[in-house]
Amino acid sequence: MRACILKVNMVLAGKNYDTPSTPKVVGETTAKVLKEHVPTDLAGVVFLSGGQTVEQATDNLAKIEKNGPFPWPVTFSFARALQDPALYAWAGNNANTDTARQAFLARLKANAEALKAQG
């Protein structure tokens, strides 16, 4: 297990649930499930953004981190939540490359800051 990295979704309310999960609930519930069920000798845990908005994914990541410490490193493995703002800024126009790059870096920085949110 020491060489395994677990790639998981955050614990969120289902699509048919009337009330979306708050970042506080996502953080507490996700941390609880991981601490109770994931072996401590794992190499790390990485989170998917799982269809969340860019902001939701970052806010939820910060709240999960606040519910640490964890016995393994925790980080993000977002695709859409990092790429969408950059792709939107680029809009298929190479003249927008620098703006797209800045949008991508802004999301990376926001998520890196979320990982510093230890409680």
Identify the role of each PLM range.
Residues 1-119:
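Active-site capping/gating regions of soluble enzymes
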